[in-house]
Structure formats: C-alpha cells, structure tokens
Amino acid sequence: MASKLELLPAVDVRDGQAVRLVHGESGTETSYGSPLEAALAWQRSGAEWLHLVDLDAAFGTGDNRALIAEVAGAMDIKVELSGGIRDDDTLAAALATGCTRVNLGTAALETPEWVAKVIAEHGDKIAVGLDVRGTTLRGRGWTRDGGDLYETLERLNSEGCARYVVTDIAKDGTLQGPNLELLRNVCAATDRPVVASGGVSSLDDLRAIAALVPLGVEGSIVGKALYAKAFTLEEALEAVAK
C-alpha cells in the first residue's frame, strides 16, 4: 500500500499536440503545444510519474505511436501509457517504449480472454482502465457501453489484475472535483491499488483523494487543473506529501 499519494501529471496527445478534452469527448480539445515539452516540464517540476495518452489510438482515428515512443524514451521518470492498447500489436508497441506500465481500456471490455492472458503474462506492467458513468463501464473512447463496473471488477480480480485506473467520465476535464464515493466503492470491491482520474480542480481535491490512501487509492492523475494553472505541480506534490 502506498504511504503517500502518487501524482501522475497527464499528457494527452491528439494529432501530434498535447491537448485536454472535456468529458473525454472528441471535438472538445484545447491544445497545449508540444507533448515532449509538456512532459519534460512535468519532469523538471518534480513529477515521479507521467500519464501519457494516445487519444487518436483511443478514438480509432490513427495513432501517434512514434511521438509517444519519443516522449516515453526521453523521460527519466516512470511512465504509464494509455490509449488504444487492445491487441498483441498495440501492446508490444507500448511495452517497447520502455514505459513502466500500460493501461488497457476498451480491450478489457471487448476481449476479456485476451486481457486475462496479458495479465497472466505481464503482471504488474498491466493496469486496467475502468472508465465509468454511474456504474456502467464505457469503452472505445467512451462512446460505447461496456458492462457493469462491479461484475467486471470481480472478474479482473479473479484473473489477478494488479491495479485499476478509475475515471468518472462525468467529471473528466470539468474541474468539478473528483468522485470520492466511486473511489471508495471501488476500493471496497478490490484489494488491488487504485489510481484516481478525473475532476481534480484544487489542492483540496488532491488532499481529499490522499485521505483515501489507507483504503487503497495509490495515485491520482492530474490533467486540466495543471494546464489551467489552478495550481502548480510543486504545490500539488507538497499538498499530498503531508
């Protein structure tokens, strides 16, 4: 169990640019320039993790594979890679970047047998992204329903999934605060570590998530709040270190 909350600043890549979306919806992006520059800036600011997402791969609108590999390769810190990892080819490409772990999303919902095999083969290098609206999972860039959250959790627990990245889609990119109840419920349903994603808007939000560390929350992905300059990464790291 984590002793303090890990923070994972996010770099989401769409069409070669670092962007942020609202509710994860295509067409709502705000561009923030070079993904490599953004990633290096978070590293310089003291990040121990980077959450790196290929949005084109997630939405099925192409990919930024070469750029993602370049960014991951330039990092001296740990990298969690996400977006469109749903078969042997995309998984091999993701792992070849040297990232610390990969997040499976849609694939986990559409090809459960493959996910079970990958978890068995790669263990701690695999996390499963649980993108939730209510208690329903959403797949493929959040445009399709993918089953019940708790039934899926039960299955993945039994298959030995090492960790979960939990996103409340209703909160993501909105700066409206995290869904603490969802995080508590997921922690109650699994003994694996949970990484929170979506809605962080303030240092108080991060402190509230940090208070869930004893329940099993290990980390928090922070995106729009950092880019919108609601607080600095240094301030965030200090807030959760206490």
Swiss-Prot record:
Record's GO cellular component terms: cytoplasm
Stored InterPro entries: Aldolase_TIM, His_biosynth, HisA/PriA_Actinobacteria, Isoase_HisA-like, Isoase_HisA-like_bact, RibuloseP-bd_barrel
Family from the record: Belongs to the HisA/HisF family.
Chemical reaction(s) catalysed: 1-(5-phospho-beta-D-ribosyl)-5-[(5-phospho-beta-D-ribosylamino)methylideneamino]imidazole-4-carboxamide = 5-[(5-phospho-1-deoxy-D-ribulos-1-ylimino)methylamino]-1-(5-phospho-beta-D-ribosyl)imidazole-4-carboxamide; N-(5-phospho-beta-D-ribosyl)anthranilate = 1-(2-carboxyphenylamino)-1-deoxy-D-ribulose 5-phosphate
The protein's name in its UniProt record: Phosphoribosyl isomerase A
Record function comment: Involved in both the histidine and tryptophan biosynthetic pathways.
Residues annotated as the enzyme's active site: 12, 131
Keywords: Amino-acid biosynthesis, Aromatic amino acid biosynthesis, Cytoplasm, Histidine biosynthesis, Isomerase, Tryptophan biosynthesis
NCBIfam families to which the protein is assigned, alphabetical: hisA-trpF
Places the protein is found: Cytoplasm
Organism: Streptomyces avermitilis (strain ATCC 31267 / DSM 46492 / JCM 5070 / NBRC 14893 / NCIMB 12804 / NRRL 8165 / MA-4680)
Entry EC no(s): 5.3.1.16, 5.3.1.24
Coiled-coil regions listed in the entry: none
